[in-house]
Amino acid sequence: METLITISRWLAKQHVVTWCVQQEGELWCANAFYLFDAQKVAFYILTEEKTRHAQMSGPQAAVAGTVNGQPKTVALIRGVQFKGEIRRLEGEESDLARKAYNRRFPVARMLSAPVWEIRLDEIKFTDNTLGFGKKMIWLRDSGTEQA
């Protein structure tokens, strides 16, 4: 639990996620502002259905991605690598996520793009501020945490 709490605190302070999807051997990555839900261990993003990454995702797809800062020295590197699943939200689930997203990013009220959830199933958090190469791992299915 401690690992997930540490990772969640760091993710709550960031705001841009990069995620990649694959379809028929073709890979594509995208970036977006995200809202992190620590209870569901998921990102919420907005992206238009006509985008290449949304077309490749369809209603849901496997994803992998990263969240990282931009430190000027190796000793300050912190970042997350993850794998999970992206899906487009519908109905009340979408409405609730959009309200929370709009609170975090008020400018998003101007957008009509659908809300998507990236459910994280595996997270590796690198935090060089705790020592070079310090990694923490969290796995959804097993609840496993490694430091």
UniProtKB/Swiss-Prot annotation:
Gene3D superfamilies: Electron Transport, Fmn-binding Protein, Chain A
Family: Belongs to the UPF0306 family.
The protein, known as: UPF0306 protein YhbP
Species: Shigella boydii serotype 18 (strain CDC 3083-94 / BS512)
